[in-house]
């Protein structure tokens, strides 16, 4: 009886190991997927949790290599975050104020997404890259990866990446050292769509106050 139980346990463990994806192979497949992209358009939902509060926002995201991104928030408040790779702007029409900073100085929670904009290598960017079997994916067929961004470890504890079977990243969860977290969910992804450089330029509307410095939301 004990022998049968032991054999059954070993067979089960072997099956689990056989079905679990290889982290290096999966990471390389994700790298290859994003390295061939020139542009990406997606709908996003941003979920923030921290300081006893929760906030949910949504809109449309455009990315273009090298280093360009535009986030257009529609709900619950209209606002824009845009970077042409040199300058970054954060603008809330209702406030009539635009904040500007150099993109290279940007310490924004969106900055971990920058690896989607250039030559990516997850194993190089994320220390301790591994599977996260303790984290439930949104879709059963997805796989969740865990890692610590080497360049941002002073303010980020870990990043979780949910990867779909076609190697698209459909969710990014960022846990910060202050106990807060920001989650991005991406749907309706469109790859290599025409996007002009003008979409990543920002000109403050007349009557808008411009503030140089951080881009706090």
Describe the residue ranges of each PLM region:
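Short beta-strands and strand-coil junctions in structured, solvent-facing domains, enriched
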Residues: 50-51, 70, 77-80, 90, ...
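Short hydrophobic/aromatic-rich beta-strand segments that constitute the beta-sheet cores
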Residues: 44, 69-73, 88-91, 147, ...
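An acidic-aromatic
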Residues: 60-112, 182
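Bacterial N-terminal signal peptides
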Residues: 1-13
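Flexible, processing/modification-adjacent segments and terminal tails
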Residues: 19-48, 54-55, 82, 92-156, ...
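Gly/Pro-enriched, hydrophobic low-complexity segments
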Residues: 124-214
